[in-house]
């Protein structure tokens, strides 16, 4: 089997970088992109000058200004960011068609069969970084590795504006020293449970059998075992089929109780219906879900198999989700999981051959 060559590209503070490029007087000063503090806005991203003060994405703009009183907050210009992302992807396509976008500013590339630079993934990554810098006047960080799990870790290793390569013969030693918190899918709860078992890094994980990990963590235990051994067979998928469709709204004033939340549902449901109508014939709607973010930024999502997608069904889901926190609400969202009709059609064609 041919050794895979995967590149993970991650733009450095992308939205903020575009703003500093287009408004040079913003460069070198603490800058964030997000909503205004007066309208209960949230930080989408910030530059490294702002991060030095502790400002982070998903933080309320009001709190960010407390940490950094000189912080400049600008409104997002999504069309500018989308255009920059399109330009970057045009560069990607000069090297491979196997591109898996994760967001506007992040993507995996499989260059295993690329002929550029005699097939050197490292030189391809260097050239992509050079071209993005020259054409868009922003920087990107890149990670090169034999799989997606390691390529993503590598791109973060020398941020910002860095390149880090993990060759196949380095995988064993590199992964052994990785803390379990670096593993894809390991959040605080799983990390705490691993810690109680005396598992701090991947070397510790390797000391446990696959069966023992499955007993402790269910099917995710098998995934943990694979990652601890540097194994990740997930392909780079350039299929943009959707998993769900949703709509959400952050309110200027907290919704104080369930009744106030329920009043907002009809408008959300109307918008959701319009979005679903645009996808008719491509997807079959599945489970409905609701998302509630409380005033203290804790949030919960609830979905239910077999439930309808009418107002009454969403009201029941919202009531259950609200009860989990029973606090004032700053954001409400509703949505539907989707089943791809094109995939089902392709399967029928396959079995009919």
Swiss-Prot record:
Its BP terms in the Gene Ontology are:
DNA-templated DNA replication; error-prone translesion synthesis; SOS response
Q: Identify the main location.
A: cytoplasm
Superkingdom assignment: Bacteria
One protein family per Pfam: IMS_C
PROSITE patterns for the chain: UMUC
The answer to whether keyword Transit peptide applies is no
EC id: 2.7.7.7
Give all residue intervals belonging to the UmuC domain: 6-187
GO terms for CC? Answer: cytosol
Protein name, per record: DNA polymerase IV
Task: Write down the InterPro entries for this protein, in alphabetical order.
Answer: DNA/RNA_pol_sf, DNA_pol_Y-fam_lit_finger_sf, DNA_pol_Y-fam_little_finger, DNA_polymerase-Y, DNApol_IV, PolY_HhH_motif, Rev_trsase/Diguanyl_cyclase, UmuC
Q: Which CDD domains does the entry mention?
A: PolY_Pol_IV_kappa
Site (Substrate discrimination) at 15
Q: Which UniProt keywords apply?
A: Cytoplasm, DNA damage, DNA repair, DNA replication, DNA-binding, DNA-directed DNA polymerase, Magnesium, Metal-binding, Mutator protein, Nucleotidyltransferase, Transferase
> Catalytic activity, per the record?
DNA(n) + a 2'-deoxyribonucleoside 5'-triphosphate = DNA(n+1) + diphosphate
Cofactor binding, per record? Binds 2 magnesium ions per subunit.
Summarizing the function annotation, the protein's role is: Poorly processive, error-prone DNA polymerase involved in untargeted mutagenesis. Copies undamaged DNA at stalled replication forks, which arise in vivo from mismatched or misaligned primer ends. These misaligned primers can be extended by PolIV. Exhibits no 3'-5' exonuclease (proofreading) activity. May be involved in translesional synthesis, in conjunction with the beta clamp from PolIII.
């Amino acid at each position: 089997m041919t050794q895979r060559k995967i590149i993970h590209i991650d733009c450095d503070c992308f939205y903020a970088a575009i703003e500093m490029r287009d408004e040079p007087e913003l460069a070198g000063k603490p800058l964030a992109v997000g909503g205004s503090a007066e309208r209960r806005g949230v930080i989408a991203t910030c530059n490294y000058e702002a991060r030095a003060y502790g400002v982070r994405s998903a933080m309320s703009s009001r709190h960010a200004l407390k940490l950094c009183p000189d912080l400049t907050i600008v409104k997002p210009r999504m069309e500018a960011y989308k255009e920059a992302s399109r330009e970057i992807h045009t560069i990607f396509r000069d090297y491979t068609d196997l591109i898996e976008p994760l967001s506007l500013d992040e993507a995996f590339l499989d260059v295993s069969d690329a002929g550029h630079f005699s097939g050197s993934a490292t030189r391809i990554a260097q050239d992509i970084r050079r071209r993005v810098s020259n054409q868009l006047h922003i920087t990107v960080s890149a990670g090169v590795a034999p799989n997606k799990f390691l390529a993503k870790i590598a791109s973060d290793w020398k941020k910002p504006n860095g390149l880090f390569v993990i060759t196949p013969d380095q995988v064993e030693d590199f992964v052994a020293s990785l803390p379990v918190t670096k593993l894809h899918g390991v959040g605080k709860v799983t990390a705490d449970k691993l810690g109680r078992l005396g598992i701090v890094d991947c070397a510790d994980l390797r000391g446990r059998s696959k069966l023992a990990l499955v007993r402790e963590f269910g099917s995710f235990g098998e995934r943990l075992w694979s990652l601890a051994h540097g194994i990740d067979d997930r392909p780079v998928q350039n299929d943009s089929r959707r998993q769900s469709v949703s709509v959400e709204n952050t309110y200027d004033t907290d919704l104080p109780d369930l009744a106030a939340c329920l009043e907002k549902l009809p408008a959300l449901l109307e918008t959701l219906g319009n979005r679903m109508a645009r996808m008719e014939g491509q997807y079959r709607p599945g489970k409905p879900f609701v998302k509630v973010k409380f005033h203290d930024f804790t949030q919960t999502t609830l979905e239910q198999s077999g439930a309808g997608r009418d107002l009454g069904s969403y009201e029941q889901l919202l009531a259950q989700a609200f009860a989990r926190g029973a606090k004032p609400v700053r954001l409400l969202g509703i949505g539907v999981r989707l089943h791809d009709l094109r995939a089902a059609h392709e399967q029928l064609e396959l079995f009919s051959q």
